[in-house]
Structures are given as C-alpha cells and as structure tokens.
C-alpha cells in the first residue's frame, strides 16, 4: 500500500471486466503501473489478472486463500518486453479483487495481507443501474415509477437515519439467509481492523 510499484509482478484473481477489477485497473493507472492484458501470460513488470472460477468474486477470494494455504498455482506463459519467452511459469495468487463479504473472508483466513484500494478511493465506480425490458417498462409505467420512487426514498432514508440502516441490514440478512443483521450493519459502515500488527479495512459503502 505504501509502495504501489511493488505491485509489479503480482498475480490477482479477479472477475475480469467487473467493477472491482475496474477499481484495481484505475489504481494501476493512477500509479503508472502496467496492466498485462493477456490473462494467459505472466509479465513480471505488470499487474497480472487471472479469471476466477465461474466469474465469481467470492471465488476470487477462495482461490487466493487456496493458493496461500496449499500452494495452489496457475500456469502462465512468461512474457518479457511484450514477447513470449517460451517458458511456462507456475505462479501463486498474490491477491484478489472482490466485494464485501469477500474482503472479510480473506482477512479472516489469512495473515500478512492488507487492502490496497477500494471504492472509497474511486467512488464513481459504485453507480447503480436498473436494467429492464423496454417493451415491458413502457407497458407498466406505473410499476416502473413506483420501483424508482421507492428505491430513491429508501436510499435517502438509509443515508440519513440509522434506524433505516439497521432495518436494511435486517433485510439483507433475511434475504440472503447469511450472517446476522449486526454483521451486515458493521460491514456497511466499514471496519478498521488489525491482525498481527497489520491494519486493514473491510466493508464500507458510499451510501453512508
């Protein structure tokens, strides 16, 4: 984190093209670190991304944990100055791009790791879109207006009133049948933690 150039040569498991990957690419660009555009190769002078299984951001973290704990590697063709050397290298995974709760999973399982960049640094990456079939939307104008109105109202209330944030956390826990409302509330607010003397951040949302 203190020396961005040390990211050169790392291998990161990621959903390539997803928003969390975009945040990492923005970080690389801001710090003038090359990105290897070929996920089947390894460039020691660039940040290398490998696709996570099933394009799943939770699998990105699971693959990082697996690599660090069991020595799991990915075979990558070596590239030097843009040219293949003919060698294939077995490289461990050094990091992952993910969304909460993937970050908490990683830090719970591993030591010696920290967060490097997040949507707190590139807040515009968190824009939200609602995708609908145009024909259906035109035929159901009242419903579409109601969806938008209620979404905007809820978002506004959650930002302003803590009891709404608590209720939203309860809804998430119930909807996904995962963890407790307090778990989600704390992660939505963001937590600064320390493990083995190393600080890291988990969670946190621009809406708050």
Please give the residue ranges for each predicted region.
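A conserved helix-loop-strand patch within extracytoplasmic ligand-binding domains
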Residues: 1-90, 112-122, 128, 134-138
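Structured segments of extracytoplasmic/periplasmic soluble domains
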Residues: 15, 27-34, 63-67, 105, ...
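Short, Asp-centered acidic motifs that coordinate Mg2+ and/or phosphate
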Residues: 93-95
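Secondary-structure end/capping motifs
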Residues: 137-208
């Amino acid at each position: 984190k203190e020396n961005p150039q040390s990211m050169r040569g790392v291998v990161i498991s990621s959903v390539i093209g997803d928003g969390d990957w975009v945040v990492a690419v923005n970080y690389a660009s801001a710090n003038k670190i090359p990105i290897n555009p070929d996920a089947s190769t390894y460039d020691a002078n660039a940040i290398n991304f490998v696709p996570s299984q099933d394009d799943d951001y939770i699998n990105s973290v699971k693959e990082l944990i697996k690599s660090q704990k069991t020595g799991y590697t990915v075979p990558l063709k070596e590239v030097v100055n843009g040219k293949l050397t003919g060698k294939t290298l077995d490289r461990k995974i050094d990091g992952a791009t993910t969304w909460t709760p993937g970050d908490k999973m990683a830090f719970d399982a591993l030591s010696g790791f920290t967060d490097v960049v997040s949507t707190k640094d590139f807040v515009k990456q968190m824009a939200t879109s609602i995708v609908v079939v145009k024909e259906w939307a035109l035929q159901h104008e009242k419903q579409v207006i109601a969806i938008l109105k209620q979404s905007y109202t809820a978002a506004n209330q959650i930002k302003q009133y803590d009891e709404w944030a608590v209720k939203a956390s309860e809804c998430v826990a119930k909807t996904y049948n995962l963890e407790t409302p307090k778990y989600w509330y704390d992660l939505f607010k963001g937590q600064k933690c320390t493990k083995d003397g190393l600080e890291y951040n988990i969670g946190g949302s621009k809406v708050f």
